[in-house]
Amino acid sequence: SRNFLPNMKQVRHALAEKLGAFPDDLVCVSNATEGLNIIAHSMRLNAGDEILTSDHEYGALEKTWDAVGKRTNARIVKVEVPVPLTSAVEFCDIIKTGMSDRTKVLFLSHVTSPTSLVFPLKEVIAEARSRGIITIVDGAHAPGLIDLDLNDLNADFYSGNCHKWMMSPKGAAFLWARQDVQPMLEPLVVSHGWVAQLGGS
């Protein structure tokens, strides 16, 4: 349809306003699992590198990271997060116990699928950034359920669904990336709209 690209631009601008983001930092994907697979398979990992996560993650994404680990010989490190959480400080301290000089990626849910916890991510993202660790957030259940300001949260990558609490049709989701890490992304499918100098768009 000749209206497809203008409509997609309109969607990105409306979504950016709702999510506290810039339109150029957002792309539309079919669901958060697809967006997170794009991110995960774009990570340049080596043997011995570590991917840090929690024991509250969505099963499909656990399989995604297992596949990445198998392909790259990176190691998955999973920390146990107690229920209930008492504070953001406690959460950050727990996640820090899993960090080492080999940790390259931190992958956490914003709202967990199996346990419905809202992880207080801002402090742990800042801690990871100070250590040079890439932060990736599974936001499948967050948009529309909690207030989001992606620029303020300041993760490296975030993917969320719009068909849950935002009441959009299935097939409506987004991938967000901070501008300086966007060249890391490699699309799973290359077609119209790919921009070579960015490595994808």
Enumerate the language-model features and the residues they cover.
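Pyridoxal 5′-phosphate
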Residues: 1-201
